[in-house]
């Protein structure tokens, strides 16, 4: 009996996951995230140099970050731009150096382009959440400016704190000697989860539950880590881009990776947005749970009725009706005068 109950619960669980995946697939088709990812990748490439220039300017404004600027750059390019990170870092640093020599109007234009990227991200995520109410211009600009100014500061502060924790003598013992390398190895994964979680909870112009956002963030972070390893393996083992494009191979490699990254980000957003819809649908509907063969689970717990039992019950009902008819009072008739 207990095994049957456990089997039924497992069937219900897998069927629930399957129905959620079907709902998620329908959402992905409706929202066309491949087109949205292509748009965001194009805007990202246009805004990459301005965004990096603004980020480095914000880090330079704080003396505590001057000593670790190289570490921050190495961490970002190594963990978020696989295979071609070194080449991209050289070019972007050169572009940023040229951009920093511009006039005030040019620097203001860089800030505007960086804001355009954040605005495109905001619109894409709010479209996924089916948000009808738009933020006012003042609120939207304030949020975009906060992301540009506070985002680099938070990233730098987290890396500084991590470097400080690693350097503590508390972790120099034999018992904890293997903990820190494992922690440092998982650090990019933790940063990815935190970044996706913050993105899915703050950007949508509606309330998002923490656990829903955490689910989407964890899935997106796992796919991002797998994507990094898979893309780096493809670029190194199958150097078709370098054979075709030569010295310009970095450009298509960067574009493809940015496109895949946005596909992963939007997929995590779709999971986060689809979860409350699916739960509301399940709670409001009275759909009969079925097993993997399509049979109702309720019917499995109903005992089978033999044909002999049905015929015996039918004959007993006929005899009862005959007795009632025999005991009924006879109607009297009046003679005609």
Swiss-Prot record:
InterPro entries cross-referenced by the UniProt entry: UPF0761_bac, Virul_fac_BrkB
Main location: membrane
Transmembrane residue ranges: 4-24, 45-65, 102-122, 137-157, 183-203, 213-233, 247-267
CC annotations in GO: plasma membrane
Disordered: annotated span: 292-337
Entries under NCBIfam families matching the protein: PRK01637.1, yihY_not_rbn
Name of the protein this chain belongs to: UPF0761 membrane protein Shewana3_0311
Species of provenance: Shewanella sp. (strain ANA-3)
Lineage, uppermost ranks: Bacteria, Pseudomonadati, Pseudomonadota, Gammaproteobacteria, Alteromonadales
């Amino acid at each position: 009996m207990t095994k049957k109950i456990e089997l039924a619960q497992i069937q219900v669980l897998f069927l629930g996951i399957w129905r959620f995946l079907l709902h998620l697939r329908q959402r992905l088709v409706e929202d066309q995230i491949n087109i949205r990812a292509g748009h965001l990748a194009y805007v990202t490439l246009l805004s990459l140099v301005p965004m990096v220039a603004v980020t480095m300017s914000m880090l330079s404004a704080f003396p505590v970050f001057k000593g670790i600027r190289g570490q921050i750059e190495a961490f970002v390019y190594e963990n978020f731009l696989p295979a071609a990170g070194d080449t991209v870092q050289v070019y972007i640093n050169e572009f940023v150096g040229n951009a920093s020599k511009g006039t005030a109007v040019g620097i203001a234009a860089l800030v505007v382009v960086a804001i355009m990227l954040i605005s495109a991200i905001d619109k894409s995520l709010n479209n996924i959440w089916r948000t009808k109410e738009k933020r006012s211009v003042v609120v939207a600009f304030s949020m975009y400016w906060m992301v540009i100014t506070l985002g680099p500061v938070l990233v730098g502060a987290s890396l500084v704190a991590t470097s400080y924790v690693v350097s503590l003598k508390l972790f120099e013992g034999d018992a904890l000697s293997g903990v820190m390398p494992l922690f440092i190895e998982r650090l990019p994964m933790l940063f990815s989860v935190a970044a996706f979680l913050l993105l899915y909870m703050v950007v949508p112009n509606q309330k998002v539950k923490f656990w829903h956002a955490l689910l989407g963030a964890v899935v997106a972070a796992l796919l991002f880590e797998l994507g990094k390893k898979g893309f780096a393996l493809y670029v190194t083992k199958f150097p078709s881009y370098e054979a075709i494009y030569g010295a310009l191979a970095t450009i298509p490699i960067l574009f493809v990776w940015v496109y895949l990254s946005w596909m992963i980000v939007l997929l995590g957003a779709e999971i986060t947005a689809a979860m409350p819809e699916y739960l509301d649908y399940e709670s409001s509907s009275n759909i009969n749970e079925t097993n993997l063969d399509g049979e109702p689970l309720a019917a499995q717990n109903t005992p089978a009725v033999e044909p002999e039992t049905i015929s015996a019950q039918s004959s007993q009902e006929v005899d009862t009706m005959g007795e009632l008819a025999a005991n009924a009072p006879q109607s009297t008739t009046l003679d005609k005068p």
